[in-house]
Amino acid sequence: MERIRKYLVSEKFAAEAYHGGMEQDKRERALYKFRSGCCNVLVSTDLAARGLDIPEVRHIVHYHLPANEEAFIHRSGRTGRWDETGNIYIIVGPEEHVPEFIGEAAEWNVDGERINPVSPAWVTLYIGRGKKDKLNKVDILGFLCKKGGLTAKDVGRID
């Protein structure tokens, strides 16, 4: 999975990894970047299949075939939520077949076709300080506006 993330980053995609082998703070940062639009690709294990409530996930790509129907449903359930639409893609090699529980799928061959990455709408700035350090959101916004030449509208969420 990390290999896939590194490849996507080398191809100029804003990708983050999310898996159980990561430290909790790194998982939280990856999710924050994905939720806030600072990264538009989240490469994950089944850890993301349950319990994540992220709106507007438009695409799910299954790189490894799910072991069973329940896993497929939970993985795919991250898209098309709240009456929105979503797309599910399954990458299979020449020797693999799509399991019956997935049903009929349209076939699409890439054949070396290059997809240009879409730049994220935002960039994450991590400041490892907070209330304990007597640093609040207003201070951060003021600093970014005064020293960075930004307006309040240029600054997204401050968490």
Language-model-derived ranges and their functions:
Residues 41, 67-107:
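Conserved segment of the helicase C-terminal RecA-like domain
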Residues 1, 22-24, 47-50, 65-69, ...:
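Conserved nucleotide-binding/hydrolysis micro-motifs of P-loop NTPases
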Residues 110-159:
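Non-catalytic terminal extensions of ATP-dependent helicases
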Residues 50-65, 87-91:
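A short beta-strand element within the Helicase C-terminal
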Residues 1-49, 56:
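Helicase motor core with emphasis on the C-terminal RecA-like subdomain
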Residues 4, 30, 72-75, 100-102, ...:
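Hydrophobic side chains in well-ordered alpha-helices
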Residues 58, 86-90, 123-131:
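Short hinge/gating elements
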Residues 15, 43, 60, 77, ...:
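Residue-level signature of catalytic and energy-coupling elements of molecular machines
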